[in-house]
A protein has these predicted regions:
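Residue-level recognition of alpha-helix initiation/capping sites
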Residues: 84, 106-108
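Short acidic/polar active-site loop segments enriched in Thr and Asp
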Residues: 99
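Gly/Thr-rich phosphate-binding loop signature of adenosyl cofactor/nucleotide-binding cores
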Residues: 2-94
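Long, charge-dense
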Residues: 120-121
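Short, glycine/polar-rich helix-capping loops at beta-to-alpha or helix-loop-helix junctions
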Residues: 108-115
Length: 121
């Protein structure tokens, strides 16, 4: 992961706000929570986490310092769960102090994702 200010020098972490400002257009990211949520945390690992096991409720080896990337598989399974279950899963992720959530493939996040992440802001 590199900072927008020093593209040739690797950094150990990057603020979510800086990540969004630096790479949002290039990655075609769209903010679905309020701007205040960008100030909430820092991305501390260079890799992303596909939270496939977390969406089932298994958090034993959850990589909470990484961007949480929900792809088509995670979102399909997640949407099959009840709204209450989805809320619990996202609340558990937030309690583990994740830096941010990215939903790929132009998929929409669930209302529970948006609500819980906004409240954690």
């Amino acid at each position: 992961m590199t900072s927008s200010k020093t593209k040739s020098q690797a950094v150990e972490s990057i603020a979510v706000r800086e990540f969004f400002s630096s790479f949002g257009k290039q990655l075609k990211l769209r903010l679905v929570t309020s701007d205040k949520t960008l100030s909430r945390s820092t991305i501390k690992e260079k890799s992303v986490n596909r939270p496939a096991l977390a969406v089932t409720g298994y958090f034993k080896y959850f990589a909470n310092k990484r961007i949480q990337l929900f792809g088509a598989g995670e979102m399909a399974f997640f949407r099959e769960q009840s709204a209450a279950r989805r809320k619990v899963v996202v609340e558990t992720m937030v309690a583990k102090r994740i830096p941010c959530v990215v939903v790929s493939r132009s998929l929409a996040p669930t209302p529970e994702m948006v609500d819980v992440l906004e409240q954690a802001g």
